[in-house]
Amino acid sequence: MKLKPGKLPPDLLQKLVEGFVIHDSVSIGPGIGFDSAVIDIGKEYLVVTSDPITFVTEDIGYYTVAVNINDIAVTGAEPSFMTLTVLISQEDADSEKVSKIFNDVRNTAREYGISVIGGHTEVTPSIESTITSATMMGFVEKHKLVRQDGAKPGDVVVMMGLAGVEGTSIIARELDLSGSFSTEEIERMKNFYRDPGIIILDKVRCLKKFTTPTSMHDPTEGGIAQAIHELARASNTGFLIEFEKIPVHPLTLKLSKILDFNYLGLISSGSLIATVKESEVSRISCPDLKIIGKVTEKSSGVKLLRQGRVEDLPRFPQDEITKILA
């Protein structure tokens, strides 16, 4: 079977991760929708995640730290340590370019109190553009761990942040949009990765002040829609999402119409999807929290309510950005 760019098909991935030897201390191992492993180390859990940066050619050091922070944060853990791998293309084999990557990693890690403890670097002719990847580790008290398979029917689905922020920023920096947007609009979109930003640690911290979510997910490749499908699969439930309640920036909406893509399937680091018990929703006071749906029985499927009509929530095994930047 010829594979397309993007995430592997879930059924194939499930087969690939089956059969690994799992140590007794592993509480959560590899699985669909599980971005982090959880290891029992006694009084706490050690949470471990790995994520590469493949879509971005600028500021990849910042992105590398950011996306791994997010994977740790959605478990309820605080990020603490990371290792870094930098595979440098021959085109980028320049000391100034490499120094910028490391400076961005250093500054971002320092800002969030993360120690970079090792890694690997090399120049390789095997890739067209530089690829970075990190493994990040964090710690969480056992009773505060948030599992991605914890959603239950009746839970409320909430969202913080905006759909497609990361993808909008990448597109604005990779394509010439001057024929459709003003200079000010283009610069605004380019800066989306900083403002409103793609790191969700503060959003998670706010949510945790008021409740312990039953599940959390940071929508990366495949966007909001794919994140919902992954939560549904992990928790063995259905979801009903209200389209009109999903927050999106007007510039992302305009961009989606001009380039003909669905922003629900656009890479969306910077947003947070969580499920919380219905009885706890009213006490949550976080600045940009929106209620966007509810968790249903598995038999109900994963649905989208749009203009009063219920339809299947689309899947995006390949992020919408892949067809734009192809």
What is the meaning of each model-derived region?
Residues 40-48, 53, 78-176, 294:
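Glycine-rich anion-binding loops of enzyme active sites
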Residues 3-13, 286-326:
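Acidic, Ser/Thr/Pro-rich beta/coil linker or hinge segments at domain junctions
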Residues 275-281:
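Helix N-cap motif at beta-to-alpha junctions
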Residues 28-31, 219-220, 238-247, 265-267, ...:
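Beta-strand->loop->alpha-helix junctions that form or flank phosphate-binding loops
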Residues 169-186, 190:
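Short, compositionally biased
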Residues 1-74, 156:
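N-terminal glycine-rich phosphate/pyrophosphate-binding loops that anchor nucleotide-derived ligands
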Residues 57-83, 100-111, 202-206, 226-230:
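Small-aliphatic-rich amphipathic alpha-helix that forms the alpha element of a beta-alpha
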Residues 90-93, 192-267:
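Active-site-proximal betaalpha loop/short-helix elements
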